[in-house]
A protein has these predicted regions:
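The conserved SAM/SAH-binding core of class I Rossmann-like methyltransferase domains
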Residues: 1
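Mobile active-site "lid"/loop adjacent to the S-adenosyl-L-methionine
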Residues: 26, 43-73
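Helix-to-beta-strand junctions that scaffold the AdoMet/dcAdoMet cofactor pocket
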Residues: 78-80
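Short amphipathic alpha-helical segments
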Residues: 12, 37-38, 55-61, 98-99
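S-adenosyl-L-methionine
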Residues: 4-47
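A structural alpha-helix within SAM-dependent methyltransferase catalytic domains
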Residues: 37, 68-75, 103
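Flexible loop/turn segments at secondary-structure boundaries
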Residues: 7-8, 32-33, 54-56, 92-95, ...
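C-terminal catalytic and target-recognition region of SAM-dependent MTase-like enzymes
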Residues: 42, 69, 83-145
Length: 145
């Protein structure tokens, strides 16, 4: 599921080339997740990789709320024992604050997370020591209990 039509079309082409049966959906994540919750759909794995929600310091609180809300919805869609992976590419959001936001979202859903790892950019995505915001990619890997 992606809001970008071109990304969905490319994914469909790749799936067809590799002869994989995958359902690709062009939709807004918030709308689609709410629909899945209403329909009682649960998945073995949920991966959330939204666009940058915190664009500037003025939008920090609004961005945190979006991360919180999207992760609450995502957690409602993953079955107990399922894989839950969530990402942030907001440079102004620290890894600690990102993790705190995800844990808070899980608690509001009455869920616990068994956090397996908190990762970030790979070696092919370097950042300057004098510009910590360049280390903007954060990925939390967990089992949703």
């Amino acid at each position: 599921m992606d809001l970008d039509e071109k990304a969905v079309a490319m994914a469909k082409r790749n799936g067809n080339i590799n002869r994989q049966r995958i359902d690709f959906v062009h939709a807004d994540a918030f709308v689609y997740a709410r629909q899945m919750v209403r329909n009682g759909r649960l998945f073995d794995a949920v991966l959330l990789d939204p666009p940058k929600f915190i664009v500037g310091r003025d939008g920090y609180e609004e961005g945190i709320k979006k991360y919180h809300d999207l992760n609450m919805l995502g957690l409602q869609c993953v079955r107990p024992g399922g894989l839950f992976v969530t990402c942030s590419c907001s440079g102004l959001l620290s890894p600690a604050e990102f993790e705190h936001t995800i844990i808070k979202a899980a608690q509001r859903q009455g869920r616990k997370l068994q956090i397996m790892a908190m990762t970030g950019p790979g070696w092919d995505h370097p950042f300057l020591s004098t510009y910590p915001e360049g280390r903007y990619l954060k990925v939390l890997w967990a089992i949703a209990l």
